């Protein structure tokens, strides 16, 4: 009986499991079987259930995770988490060395660490027990992510007696390549969107409201700095002490006595970069002596004693075997490169983006060419150039097909001469894409209805258009291979939930050409109801901020098509309740945003209009007075300036969460 245990025996069991965790997750040298470990953990949980008052903050059960309240409080950092300046060339590197040596008057010892591509965190210990963990945030304040950080098995929840009573460590939270592949495999099996890269996956995991789910993903941590009342005068020695106290240090810190040694090490690390278990995007160079660091000091933006040397995105060379055509939900034909498989960043690449016909013409890409492929943090790599010296004889310029590869109807060319579209409303490819988009995360967000399920239901003749989703029955789902009682109940529950749709989400889900989520929100805020949107005139639409003539014409055209109106009416008759827009949201009130780069889910004007509609302002240049920089693809110099000024950086997904918190 567990009620026979004393508190001393409970604490001894905690310490025993703590040692097992250290041997397994840090030393990778377990001395007990998984079964024996599980039995110990079950015993611990049982004792804590009998005596909840005994549970200590460093109990191994804290790693299993509880549900988080629903928000992450913002807390001020004890020391600012400044950024590190970047260098991409040897010239920039030498400038850094010259500045350091000119200030100090001699060549210092440098410590090099792998720049792991992850999420920076600060973790605080009091009385040698982990009490708080914060994200980097804007460098001055971060979000309290303690509950999810505790799920990292390699991180000690309690420190040994030789460690300082009060200690703060800084580190990078990340996923190994292998774990990242496992996570995306699970995402694919669940028909959920894959993560673009390990860094995005780590960031998303730290923000999960279920720490139990976070624990299942196996986050890793690598410490790169420590603050205590009595630090040694060597940064390298401090890291070695952290390692001795049980902290994981995966950055492979090494000391070098000369600039020549540092440069040689950078070249050597570049050679083994792809063989490392985790993604790195460079190497951090630090002046090792902490007194020298104080002399060098810092700017408002970054430390003067550290520099991040960034490697260029990895490129591969392979053969372009074919150019395939994908048909999207609006009928747009998109060319995709079929490649002879090539390994990039540790994974096999056989498909790459070609964007559109104009891009293919500009780069003169032909089938049979030897092409350069680059993987720069996206799921789908891109073809960046052609090796003309290796072009085979007889190749011909590629031209967009005149007929849809799916329904074989003639395609039409848009007035912008870039988009080529299949206008056949019955085309199966476009129909499936429309349905998939309709139920997707950025639209009605109907869980458990992924692309494979949609395609199977379509192939079985159970759905033909979007409104059919709301008529799916248990008998229909039983015909889908692999579906069981629990899965069927989950799908039907999600469909029922989606019947109460906020106006802006419903409009976005319709997939009106040129109307993204930003435009949908602008329409909802202006007209407040679905009826008003559907009956709006061209003149009424044109006056809305963010809705230009082209978008207005597309909206009017969409609601003048009888098929579209009939389908919406059918949805309403099936119980769909489109909720009127509420003006209560002012999520951007008093905030100033600047946007750089191209956005994917909405146009620049839609994003700006949405920010203004939520009470925010949109600036044109980066300065200390702005609150956020929103970064899309191919950002300009604004990104570098914002990083120097420590202005919070948002990607498009971050912006959408602010604009549409529900």
UniProtKB/Swiss-Prot annotation:
The record places the active site at: 115
Q: Keyword set for this entry?
A: DNA damage, DNA repair, DNA replication, Ligase, Magnesium, Manganese, Metal-binding, NAD, Zinc
Catalysed reaction(s)?
Answer: NAD(+) + (deoxyribonucleotide)n-3'-hydroxyl + 5'-phospho-(deoxyribonucleotide)m = (deoxyribonucleotide)n+m + AMP + beta-nicotinamide D-nucleotide
Which Pfam families does UniProt cross-reference here? BRCT, DNA_ligase_aden, DNA_ligase_OB, DNA_ligase_ZBD, HHH_2
Q: Is Manganese tagged as a keyword?
A: yes
This one is known as DNA ligase
Where do the annotations place Zn(2+) binding? Answer: 404, 407, 422, 427
What are the names of the required cofactors? Mg(2+); Mn(2+)
- List residues binding NAD(+): 34-38, 83-84, 113, 136, 172, 286, 310
Q: Which intervals hold domain BRCT? A: 583-662
This chain's source organism reads Chlamydia felis (strain Fe/C-56)
Does Transferase appear among the keywords?
A: no
Q: Which family does it belong to?
A: Belongs to the NAD-dependent DNA ligase family. LigA subfamily.
